């Protein structure tokens, strides 16, 4: 079984914990913007800071879509270039008419840019370029609390958290521009900027836990993930040529596996589900890419979510009796493939090893009671997408209504993730059982992403290592695009995979306010673009195939495939609405938002496990 290197923490779909070395892996630089070959850099202009990554070879690239983890935020929400940018690239981009948006400059190594008080040994460089502080734009001294930051902002954030400082209210409606020369003028806005760029509150508190205690918690979390990793084992693996075996990628043999299993739910079977790399096929035309991806998206993904939950007839019966809901069989499970006995035995051994964790978990207080369903639901939109079933089911029989007071104390067991069956554990459920429910509800969606990836033209030409890396890092972002229709921005409700809707206020009371607000905001922006089914399919492929993921064996091949998909997406968007020239740019601006959501989701799941201790 292929496992990821411990440094390959991309904030993936269910990357709940990083390596046991340090906690800030939860918001790693790779998952925020780029990997070791791609970085984020601010513009030298003093207006709105911009970010523009170098190419994997270290040379500058003029293409803002080449490494979409760092789409320049200097573009306005309407897609037009910011007026504060005073210069533009001298050569044109293949993704923009004429020249790329102005202000897309990279902070090159410049002795005049470095502040005199800082020695060159404290400057963080990447491919000969200077990394700038994400907060104020000064020269970054390293990766601090989840982002690249200077010494000043690192110390400011640490003091703010450790001393719990309440700063004086901003006099400019909390809209101060934080740059190096004025970063000390408004401390409230500076602290707000620290949080908005991804500095983690938990990175301070978690780091002060004694080493032995932290290792114990991480070991227990790892054990919980191992059981979930085997939920796919008893199901039929996707078709794999029986006479072929995984072969090394084109760049040489795969790196040795990490000593500990990868802490990912539903990903342990990726090497068995994916086919070995094949000989490169002729590059398809734009029309071929559009048609193949659109067909795969239409046939594999189900907007009615029929395959993600139970059927209406047995939904309430299962939960009333305390049984875990059964998922509807997928098309690849209907081929009559029997489960693998070896995988079943492995799952049984994991169950035996986790008896002690279950016993410890049984002493936790009862969880938040489930919420009653709202009587509103998404209706089919103008594109004809079926956003949800016409029936919304009430809370399971025999359990408390939604307006019941919170039971127990602050350690209630919560897993308020929209991609779960419920935002909480059912009555009497232990932490381990909640994890099992979560894995069972997530597994079908993950398998659909794997099947979709296999139908992307050129994806199976990549090495198997790179295929697995892309899937582990990007599956959550793909599912976020797919499940954007679960969020009803107008009614402020969200539908979980159990087909039950909850209001934003209810979920906020469960401790999920920040993540849900960010998901609502992303869903509103994405839905406002009114993507067609073909556009949504191609955008989903672009989200998955990202050359700036950490741990790639052959970044050049992934980048080439990414550019092919981007060209097809741009051609399709301009073909459908030729008058809306900024629509493609707006769509690309959603990519860094997905990276942020990916990290927030990983932190939420980690805090769930830590809070339950």
UniProtKB/Swiss-Prot annotation:
Coarse class of the primary localization is nucleus
Q: Domain NR LBD, which positions?
A: 285-613
Per UniProt, the ranges with Polar residues bias are: 1-48
Output the Gene Ontology cellular-component terms: cytoplasm; dendrite; dendritic spine; nucleus
Task: List localization entries.
Answer: Nucleus; Cytoplasm; Cell projection, Dendrite; Cell projection, Dendritic spine
UniProt modification remark: Ubiquitinated, leading to its proteasomal degradation. Ubiquitinated by the SCF(FBXW7) complex when phosphorylated by CDK1 leading to its proteasomal degradation. Ubiquitinated by SIAH2; leading to its proteasomal degradation. Rapidly ubiquitinated in response to inflammatory triggers and sumoylation is a prerequisite to its ubiquitination.
GO terms for MF: E-box binding; nuclear receptor activity; RNA polymerase II cis-regulatory region sequence-specific DNA binding; transcription corepressor binding; zinc ion binding
Q: Where does heme bind?
A: 417, 601
The Swiss-Prot or TrEMBL note on domains reads: Composed of three domains: a modulating N-terminal domain, a DNA-binding domain and a C-terminal ligand-binding domain.
Full protein name: Nuclear receptor subfamily 1 group D member 1
Gene name, please?
NR1D1
């Amino acid at each position: 079984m292929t496992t990821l290197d411990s440094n390959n923490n991309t904030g993936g779909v269910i990357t709940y914990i990083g390596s046991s070395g340090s906690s800030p892996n939860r918001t790693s630089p790779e998952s925020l913007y780029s990997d070791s070959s791609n970085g984020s850099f601010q513009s030298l202009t003093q207006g709105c800071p911009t970010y523009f990554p170098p190419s994997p070879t270290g040379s500058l690239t003029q293409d803002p879509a080449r490494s979409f983890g760092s789409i320049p935020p200097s573009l306005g929400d309407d897609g037009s270039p910011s007026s504060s940018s005073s210069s533009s690239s001298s050569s044109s981009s293949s993704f923009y008419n004429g020249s790329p948006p102005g202000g897309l400059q990279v902070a090159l190594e410049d002795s005049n840019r470095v502040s005199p008080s800082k020695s060159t040994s404290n400057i963080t460089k990447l491919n000969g370029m200077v990394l700038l502080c994400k907060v104020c734009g000064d020269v970054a001294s390293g990766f601090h609390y989840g982002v690249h930051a200077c010494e000043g902002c690192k110390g400011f954030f640490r003091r703010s958290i450790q001393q719990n400082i309440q700063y004086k209210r901003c006099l400019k409606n909390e809209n101060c521009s934080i740059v190096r020369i004025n970063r000390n003028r408004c401390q409230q806005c500076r602290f707000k900027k620290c949080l908005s760029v991804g500095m983690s509150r938990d990175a301070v508190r978690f780091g002060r836990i004694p080493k032995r205690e932290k290792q114990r918690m991480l070991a227990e979390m790892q054990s919980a993930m191992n059981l979930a990793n085997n939920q796919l084992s008893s199901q039929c693996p996707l078709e794999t040529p029986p006479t072929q075996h995984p072969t090394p990628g084109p760049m040489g043999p795969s790196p040795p596996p990490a000593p500990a299993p990868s802490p990912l739910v539903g990903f342990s079977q990726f090497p068995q589900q994916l086919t070995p790399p094949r000989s490169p096929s002729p590059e398809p035309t734009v029309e071929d890419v559009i048609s193949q991806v659109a067909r795969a998206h239409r046939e594999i993904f189900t907007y009615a979510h029929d395959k993600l939950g139970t059927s209406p007839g047995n939904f309430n019966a299962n939960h009333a009796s305390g049984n875990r809901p059964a998922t509807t069989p997928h098309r690849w499970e209907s081929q009559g493939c029997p489960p693998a006995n070896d995988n079943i035995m492995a799952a049984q051994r994991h169950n035996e090893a986790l008896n002690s964790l279950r016993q410890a978990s049984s002493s936790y207080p009862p969880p938040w009671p489930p919420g009653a369903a709202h009587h509103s639901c998404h209706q089919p939109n103008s594109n004809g997408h079926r956003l949800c079933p016409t029936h919304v089911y009430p809370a399971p029989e025999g359990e408390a209504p939604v307006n019941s007071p919170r039971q127990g104390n602050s350690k209630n067991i919560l897993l308020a993730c929209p991609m779960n069956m419920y935002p909480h554990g059912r009555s009497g459920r232990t932490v381990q059982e909640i994890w099992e429910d979560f894995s069972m509800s997530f597994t079908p969606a993950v398998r659909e992403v794997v099947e979709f990836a296999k139908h992307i033209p050129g994806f199976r030409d990549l090495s198997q290592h790179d295929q697995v890396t892309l899937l582990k890092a990007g599956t959550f972002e793909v599912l976020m695009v797919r499940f954007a229709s679960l969020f009803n921005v107008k009614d402020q409700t969200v539908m979980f995979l159990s087909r039950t809707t909850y209001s934003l206020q209810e979920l906020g009371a469960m401790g999920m306010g920040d993540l849900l607000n960010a998901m609502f905001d992303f869903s509103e922006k994405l839905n406002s673009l009114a993507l067609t089914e073909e556009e949504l399919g191609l955008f989903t492929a672009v989200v998955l195939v990202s050359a700036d993921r950490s741990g790639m064996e052959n970044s050049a091949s992934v980048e080439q495939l990414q550019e092919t998909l981007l060209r097809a997406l741009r051609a399709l968007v301009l073909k459908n609405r030729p008058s809306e020239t900024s629509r493609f740019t707006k769509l690309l601006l959603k990519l860094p938002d997905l990276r942020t959501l990916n990290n927030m989701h990983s932190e939420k799941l980690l805090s769930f496990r830590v809070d339950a201790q």
